[in-house]
């Protein structure tokens, strides 16, 4: 029954909303419409912010934290990157290429470039409507909190809960349970390929280690400060090295990406919609722009200007998809197609790494993914804190119950089929995006006022 419900909602969100009468028909989903419309609107409204203010984004990340009660700008970027790098950049890209082919990579890029401005808006609002966190200290917030503020403004009175805010919080908790499943499924598959360890064994060990970390009463994300940058740099350096060695083949790979993104063959066969949807879907899973995930971390930053936190998260979207995701995609697309035909998931990525680096490549991906999985799991549980508190109030029992549920999903995910574990996460992130957009459009004017004020002050300096 639950499986059928998840499949039904999945089809509503990611199935064809309408079909354009071109070739074999181009199916366009509700989520494609929402994300592209919002991305184009906010990019135009912010006057191409990712291009105009790129230097300001870099400066915001490097700014030192003078307030010890919250996360620094760098720590906030690290937390959001922890959930993107690994599950998004490795697993998400693999899923996009597996299901949508090389053309899906192009639409991941488009989703990121448009999504950077959306991420700026939502993260700026998260800073503005954040609240003190009596349980963990510092601050908490996110879409549930600015949705609540919007509902109070429209009703003209104080509310204990808002329906849309509560629905966002529930959707987020569902999504992060789904991500927990993807984590264990990917790691167990990678270890089976690299070391021939049964999935059950890997999943049990992974769940036990995760429990030791997250079931502490006040587990922090300080460990991510070192773990995530080191992992990301190691992975980036290795992949760039492979690309340099194969630089003569890169034009052909780029040509294939663009050809399949707009290819007449895909349109004629009715496959363009699949390429587009998988690029957008996995792009959203990777960079989270518009879904409302990253604002949960952005709200916790001790920042003297909400606009600066908007810059930090917008930069995170670009780093994630345009840089790191591209490296992963090129690694796979440099491999002769006859060697990867019929492969999906970690089988595809590890085969690609084995082609480039021999047996070391398979082991490297397995080890890297295992480390990434911990950072991702810590990151999503950090996101969950404020949403659990919004639904259940300030108490430790509700926080612990959600952690236990996430651990159970981690255990279950390692034993399920590859395609099944994605559905719950896709449903959750799709619902999150819908409820988040309900607030972003009416409240975006406040983020724009803050941006205009920032630019005026900048001119006076």
Describe each PLM feature range.
Residues 34-35, 42-58, 164, 185-191, ...:
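Membrane-interface loop-to-helix entry segments
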Residues 122-134, 240-256, 270, 300-303, ...:
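Extracellular/periplasmic helix-exit of transmembrane alpha-helices
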Residues 38-43, 81, 114-139, 148-185, ...:
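Helix-loop-helix module between adjacent transmembrane segments
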Residues 67-99, 125-128, 135-150, 163, ...:
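Alpha-helical membrane segments and immediately flanking helix-loop junctions
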Residues 45-50, 89-93, 175-188, 211-223, ...:
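Transmembrane helix-loop junctions in multi-pass membrane proteins
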Residues 48-73, 95, 101-102, 117-159, ...:
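Flexible loop linkers connecting adjacent transmembrane helices
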Residues 114-122, 202-217, 228-248, 281-284, ...:
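Selective recognition of specific alpha-helical transmembrane segments in multi-pass small-molecule
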Residues 1-87, 97-104, 115, 439-461:
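N-terminal alpha-helical transmembrane segments of multi-pass membrane transport
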